[in-house]
Amino acid sequence: MKQTASLAWALAPVVASDFEALLALRLRAMRDSLTQLGRYDEARARARLAEGFAPESTHHIEVQGQRVGFIVLKHLSHALRLDHFYIDPPWQNRGIGAKVMRWVCDQADAELLPVELCALKNSDANRFYLRWGFAKVGEGEWDNDYLRMPVTPSVRAVRAFWAALQARDWPAARACLYDGVETVWWTSGERIAGADALIDVNAHYPEGWTIQLLEVEHLQDGRVMSLARVDH
């Protein structure tokens, strides 16, 4: 049993005979968004859920023994595919979805796999996934496609370093570096040897500069590549 601040939640297995209950929950969760698009159709919803229905990849989301949602998470060769993720409307906005998404992201990070999914256009789910680090990578007539790359400890350290620089928190930035770090500014070719020297250079920039972290990627050889825009 996993704990939230106020609710205990758990994942429970699904069997084939649960299909009708899952469909009813999906219809409740999607009714408003689909109606706004003029796409609410129970027959279409049934076909969509039945397509590729795999009980072994599906879990009920339970709170104190009550079923409040379900999730379909499939392990593909290249990614985790989040096919369905719904919280029953009476249980929404209680932090349950965030706790389940944390579980999904932790799995993906542990396996160094991206998470892919699609979300209905104009639904609140789009903002939810963006907050969780998903990037929009495509769109169809009715859905947006999203991808979240895995976050490793080294990626977290790189992000923490850039955030500390932006905040001018020099002790925090220094804590992200090892003593013998060497830095090369690509634009000028300038080399900076040592963590203290790198912090000193950045500390002399005037206040008001901004950092936009454009991309952080974990490379196959274990290194992390980051691309940042610095305006000063």
Listing of model-derived features with the role each one plays in the protein:
Residues 10-24, 138:
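A short beta-loop-alpha structural element at the N-terminal edge
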Residues 27-50, 189-190:
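Conserved GNAT-fold acetyl-CoA-binding loop/helix
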Residues 50-60, 67-69, 207-210:
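A short helix-loop-beta-strand connector motif used in the catalytic cores of GNAT acetyltransferases and
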Residues 66-74, 81-86:
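Conserved beta-strand in the GNAT
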Residues 87, 93-106, 131:
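Conserved acetyl-CoA-binding loop-helix of GNAT-fold acetyltransferases
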Residues 98, 121-145:
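Conserved active-site alpha-helix within GNAT-family acetyltransferase domains
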Residues 108-120:
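Conserved GNAT acetyl-CoA-binding A-motif
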Residues 170-222:
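A solvent-exposed, acidic/Ser-Thr-rich amphipathic alpha-helical stretch
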